[in-house]
């Protein structure tokens, strides 16, 4: 187990990595696409959240660590979705929002606080960020399917349709 946040079974035939900054308003808007992709493909597509905290968002790195603690407590995606719906609060109020969201979801906030202090999830966040840089991720959200990278940080326009084309083509090739 890698600790990665995934919304499907490991045997899913198509992997979609979503490189995300949890303080990024564009990543919040990308959730609609994620929900639509889940509805359309179900477990035929594994959507994995990958951390790419941007320097301009001062709470994004802590938010990524908090998200990994939510994964450890079994509520990764609900936490991510709740936190992304509060990007303005996070930017304005800072790290207390991370614990507020955990509390609202019934997670162990003491363990959250401890995880943020002891840095137990730093390696996952650092590894994601390094891998993202290595493959050319520069902004968020960025989607990667196989060797195709789609930058949603510049524009969300038509992005879901392009993702669906790639997924459909990949699934068709595997079904032959």
Predicted feature locations:
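Context-gated lysine
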Residues: 1, 56-58, 133, 154
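A short beta-strand-turn-helix
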Residues: 1-15
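Generic serine detector
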Residues: 6-8, 85, 155
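Short clusters of hydrophobic/aromatic residues that line enzyme substrate/ligand-binding pockets
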Residues: 7, 90, 150
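A general structural-boundary detector
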Residues: 11, 53, 66, 85-88, ...
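C-terminal cap of thioredoxin/glutaredoxin-like
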Residues: 13, 19, 26-39, 100-176
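Structural alpha/beta surface segment adjacent to cysteine/selenocysteine redox centers
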Residues: 15-103, 173-174
